[in-house]
UniProtKB/Swiss-Prot annotation:
<dbReference type="GO" id="GO:0000122">
    <property type="term" value="P:negative regulation of transcription by RNA polymerase II"/>
</dbReference>
<comment type="subunit">
    <text>Interacts with TRIM27.</text>
</comment>
<dbReference type="InterPro" id="IPR002190">
    <property type="entry name" value="MHD_dom"/>
</dbReference>
<feature type="compositionally biased region" description="Acidic residues">
    <location>
        <begin position="354"/>
        <end position="363"/>
    </location>
</feature>
<feature type="compositionally biased region" description="Polar residues">
    <location>
        <begin position="1"/>
        <end position="13"/>
    </location>
</feature>
<dbReference type="Pfam" id="PF01454">
    <property type="entry name" value="MAGE"/>
</dbReference>
<feature type="compositionally biased region" description="Polar residues">
    <location>
        <begin position="701"/>
        <end position="720"/>
    </location>
</feature>
<feature type="region of interest" description="Disordered">
    <location>
        <begin position="247"/>
        <end position="296"/>
    </location>
</feature>
<feature type="region of interest" description="Disordered">
    <location>
        <begin position="1"/>
        <end position="27"/>
    </location>
</feature>
<keyword id="KW-0833">Ubl conjugation pathway</keyword>
<feature type="region of interest" description="Disordered">
    <location>
        <begin position="136"/>
        <end position="206"/>
    </location>
</feature>
<feature type="domain" description="MAGE">
    <location>
        <begin position="413"/>
        <end position="611"/>
    </location>
</feature>
<feature type="region of interest" description="Disordered">
    <location>
        <begin position="700"/>
        <end position="720"/>
    </location>
</feature>
<dbReference type="InterPro" id="IPR041899">
    <property type="entry name" value="MAGE_WH2"/>
</dbReference>
<feature type="region of interest" description="Disordered">
    <location>
        <begin position="323"/>
        <end position="379"/>
    </location>
</feature>
<feature type="compositionally biased region" description="Polar residues">
    <location>
        <begin position="140"/>
        <end position="151"/>
    </location>
</feature>
<protein>
    <recommendedName>
        <fullName>Melanoma-associated antigen D4</fullName>
    </recommendedName>
</protein>
Length: 741
């Protein structure tokens, strides 16, 4: 389950259980209280009844198509709409089959890659064993307590002078001892120490003098940390991505002392001053045990360098002596993993493009922490005689994302876009603007780098399938709202429970517009008092008027409530909010006023010209946005594949989105349906804007051609105009106080 989600525990409830009457819910539990009274208004959701909880539990047994109801907390805000949207955006059988086949292919490809990697690891281990067997140096067995040969060498302390160059025979023995390290048994808890002669024969001729000067070598080895090589899958399974979905693979153990001695070279032990007893060495050795808290902070472990290992294998097979410095560098690069500790992790994202498989080192260079070996006194190694093996091209280096990154799949993006559509429609139910940060946190999540394409696909689905447009009303705070773009609710006729609030909001917007686009609080309340609305008296349909106007409408961005500067005592004023500017227009508010007074809108000449200019500016902005959106969709190849499903807008209306007097459900995205009045844009987009402006100006100034102008203004009789007329009938005397201008 994704981060940030939770599940509702199912208790084996089903629809049949509800039909049979098990765990019956009394009628009074469903109808009493205010659970549904404010369900479709400006926010103010009531608490869910036991019947709603019963339904949610029953949804858990209806199959995987409805499991999202218990996975996403934001969908529980409106479970009925969530269920309908799940059915609406469900993929057809053919698309589901293709998606299932694609996912099965991805799983099969990942399994094949794992098998190939393990086979390569087994072949490499077999080759290593053969090389070791062919180059093993026969060492005499020493009788006594310690009879098992070993390749351990005492660790030297202090600086070492630069020794003469080693012979090829010495380097060949170094390779042999280095290859013998992987063959050591993994079950040994402590390293066993042989005789000095035996160790000298193993390490080379230049290391014998070190053992004659190092007493208590048994204690030194006993104080060394016991190590064991990882299993077959852990060492060579480099294709497994580290740190995927918060999972970290076991960290490779510290290399054995024999491997360390081989890395330091055959001459590392010669010429070293006499070491102290083993206990003193152990006391001076830094503490290497990491606490559990530090281990828990380890985010991922860098996979071993396969290219360097292949180069080392080739050199061992051909018995080519490798310089000591190169061997040390190779061993340090391949045997010691780079562990990035915890802290502020880099951005987690899923890359859907095959061409872009960048690792996290490209975003942030990880700091290599000091290891237990680096904290010991440094040893002087001789200069490298040959350069390090060249790195292979990037395409040959396996990426950590090779298994966790599927190829770019439009179905995955569209699936997340459909989820965003449901999220937007449910969140817009309260008519509070939706933040981009909430979209990223609740829906987009790991696909944050593909946010532009996902939100564009969601916008396309909203427009083509539901007749709704996603508008970004605030470019700085990134706030989004849903507005109607066509006659998408023509069947929603008659009065609704939002009619009183719709009427009040239109009155307030009209007062602000007729008073110079701003109205002080005193002027507004004076106008409302003439209608019988007072701030201290609770209205039976509107509730607390002061809270509704100064809090609810402000949160929904219909109004702005600001303090008048340099006012003493402080006074406040109201302005149009961002949502009101996008959901309605000055021309529509002016027509609303004219209809209530049975007058022509052109009688308010100054306000009419201002409304016309505002309409043209809005049209220009819409055309520019539409052009930019068309170019973006062409680049992203967004088309009819976004309209997957069997559901149409009419199905939505018939099934759920009709609101009657009893109050069952409502229009989720047009609680106050400010569809652009009469959609006059549909009439004027087909003509030239310059000629159109001249025609409008001529009709307004001379009064001629008034019939044509009136027809353009009136437009078709849409549901938005019908709702406006119903609101006008509910308050016929709203604007009786407006003076003729």
């Amino acid at each position: 389950m994704a981060e940030g989600s939770f599940s509702v525990q199912s208790e084996s409830y089903s629809v049949e259980d509800m039909d049979e009457g098990s765990d019956e819910v009394g009628e009074e539990e469903m109808v009493e209280g205010n659970d549904y009274e404010e369900f479709g208004a400006f926010g103010g959701y009531g608490t869910l009844t036991s019947f709603d909880i019963h339904i949610l539990r029953a949804f858990g047994s209806l199959g995987p198509g409805l499991r999202i109801l218990s996975n996403e907390p934001w969908e529980l805000e409106n479970p009925v709409l969530a269920q309908t949207l799940v059915e609406a955006l469900q993929l057809d059988p053919e698309t589901l089959a293709n998606e299932t086949a694609a996912r099965a292919a991805n799983v099969a490809r990942a399994a094949a890659s794992n098998r190939a990697a393990r086979a390569a690891a087994a072949a490499a281990r077999t080759a290593f064993s053969q090389v070791v067997a062919s180059h093993r140096v026969a060492t005499p067995q020493v009788s006594g307590e310690d009879t098992q040969p070993t390749t351990y060498a005492a660790e030297a302390q202090g600086p070492t002078p630069e020794p003469p160059l080693a012979s090829p025979q010495t380097s060949q023995m170094l390779v042999t001892s280095k290859m013998a390290a992987p063959e050591a048994p993994a079950t040994s808890a402590q390293s066993q120490t042989g005789s000095p002669a035996q160790e000298a024969a193993t390490e080379g001729p230049s290391s014998a003098c070190a053992f004659s000067q190092a007493p208590c070598a048994r204690e030194v080895d006993a104080n060394r940390p016991s190590t064991a090589f990882l299993g077959q899958n852990d060492v060579f399974d480099f294709t497994q991505p580290a740190g995927v979905s918060g999972m970290a693979f076991p960290r490779p153990k510290r290399p054995a002392p024999a491997q360390e001695a081989a890395t330091e070279g055959p001459s590392a032990a010669s010429g070293v001053p006499q070491t102290g007893p083993g206990r003193e060495v152990a006391a001076t050795r830094p503490k290497t045990t990491k606490s559990g808290k530090a281990l828990a902070k380890t985010r991922w472990v860098e996979p071993q360098n396969v290219v360097a290992a292949a180069a080392a294998k080739a050199k061992m097979a051909t018995s080519i002596p490798e310089p000591e410095g190169a061997a040390a560098a190779t061993a340090q690069h391949s045997a010691e993993p780079w562990a990035r500790m915890g802290g502020k992790r880099t951005k987690k994202s899923k890359h859907l493009d095959d061409e872009y498989e960048s690792s996290e080192e490209e975003r942030e260079t990880p700091a290599v922490p000091p290891t237990w070996r680096a904290s010991q006194p440094s040893l002087t190694v001789r200069a490298q005689l040959a350069p390090r093996p060249p790195m292979a091209p990037r395409s040959q280096i396996p990426s950590r994302h090779v298994l966790c990154l599927p190829p770019r799949n439009v179905t995955l993006l569209q699936e997340r876009a459909n989820k965003l559509v449901k999220y937007l429609m449910i969140k817009d139910y309260k008519k509070i603007p939706i933040k981009r940060a909430d979209m990223l946190k609740d829906v987009i999540r790991e696909y944050d780098e593909h946010f532009p394409e996902i939100i564009e696909r969601a916008t396309y689905t909203l427009e083509k399938k539901f007749g709704i447009h996603l508008k970004e009303i605030d470019k700085e705070e990134h706030l989004y709202i849903l507005v109607c773009t066509r006659d998408s609710s023509a069947r929603l006729l008659g009065k609704t429970k939002d009619t009183p609030r719709l009427s009040l909001l239109l009155v307030i917007l009209g007062v602000i517009f007729m008073n110079g686009n701003r109205a002080s609080e005193a002027v507004l309340w004076e106008a409302l008092r003439k209608m019988g609305l007072r701030p201290g008296v609770r209205h039976p349909f509107l509730g607390d008027l002061r809270k509704l106007i100064t809090d609810d409408f402000v949160k929904q961005k219909y109004l702005e409530y600001k303090k008048i500067p340099n006012s003493n005592p402080p006074e406040y004023e109201f302005l149009w909010g961002l949502r009101a500017r996008h959901e309605t227009s000055k021309m529509r508010v002016l027509r609303f006023i004219a209809q209530n007074q049975n007058r022509d809108p052109r009688e308010w000449k100054a306000h009419f010209l201002e409304a016309v200019d505002d309409a043209f500016k809005t049209m220009d902005v819409d055309m520019a946005e539409e052009h930019a959106r068309a170019q973006m969709r062409a680049q992203m190849n967004i088309g009819d594949e976004a309209l997957i499903g069997r559901w149409s807008w009419d199905d939505i209306q018939v099934e759920l989105l009709t609101w009657d007097e009893d109050g069952d459900f409502g229009d989720a995205w047009a609680r106050i349906p400010f569809a652009f009045w009469a959609r006059y844009h549909q009439y004027i987009l087909n003509s030239n804007r310059a000629n159109r402006r001249a025609t409008w100006r001529a009709g307004v100034s001379s009064g001629t051609n008034g019939g044509a102008s009136t027809s353009v203004l009136d437009g078709p009789s849409t549901s938005s105009t019908i709702r406006t007329r119903n609101a006008a009938r509910a308050g016929a005397s709203f604007f009786s106080w407006i003076q003729h201008r």
